[in-house]
Amino acid sequence: MERKQRKVYQGRVVSDKMDKTITVVVETKRNHPVYGKRINYSKKYKAHDENNSAKTGDIVRIMETRPLSKDKRFRLVEIVEEAVII
């Protein structure tokens, strides 16, 4: 039996205060069904970060996985771009 394709999202880390867990906000754009205006949507996901390598502001890629806790269903795949510290 074949496994379903796992969802992969790219987003920005908004919190890294938890141990081995990051909060990632994923922003998407959709057209309004009647008026056609582009609308921004955002959703927060908790993701597993085994090495605590991602920091707040980083752009990361996360992948769907088995449930790891009450809220965690994603894991960190890679850090696409590190945050610039000013």
Swiss-Prot record:
<dbReference type="GO" id="GO:0022627">
    <property type="term" value="C:cytosolic small ribosomal subunit"/>
</dbReference>
<keyword id="KW-0687">Ribonucleoprotein</keyword>
<comment type="similarity">
    <text>Belongs to the universal ribosomal protein uS17 family.</text>
</comment>
<dbReference type="InterPro" id="IPR019979">
    <property type="entry name" value="Ribosomal_uS17_CS"/>
</dbReference>
<keyword id="KW-0699">rRNA-binding</keyword>
<dbReference type="InterPro" id="IPR012340">
    <property type="entry name" value="NA-bd_OB-fold"/>
</dbReference>
<dbReference type="InterPro" id="IPR000266">
    <property type="entry name" value="Ribosomal_uS17"/>
</dbReference>
<dbReference type="GO" id="GO:0019843">
    <property type="term" value="F:rRNA binding"/>
</dbReference>
<dbReference type="InterPro" id="IPR019984">
    <property type="entry name" value="Ribosomal_uS17_bact/chlr"/>
</dbReference>
<dbReference type="GO" id="GO:0003735">
    <property type="term" value="F:structural constituent of ribosome"/>
</dbReference>
<comment type="function">
    <text>One of the primary rRNA binding proteins, it binds specifically to the 5'-end of 16S ribosomal RNA.</text>
</comment>
<dbReference type="GO" id="GO:0006412">
    <property type="term" value="P:translation"/>
</dbReference>
<dbReference type="Pfam" id="PF00366">
    <property type="entry name" value="Ribosomal_S17"/>
</dbReference>
<keyword id="KW-0689">Ribosomal protein</keyword>
<protein>
    <recommendedName>
        <fullName>Small ribosomal subunit protein uS17</fullName>
    </recommendedName>
</protein>
<keyword id="KW-0694">RNA-binding</keyword>
<comment type="subunit">
    <text>Part of the 30S ribosomal subunit.</text>
</comment>
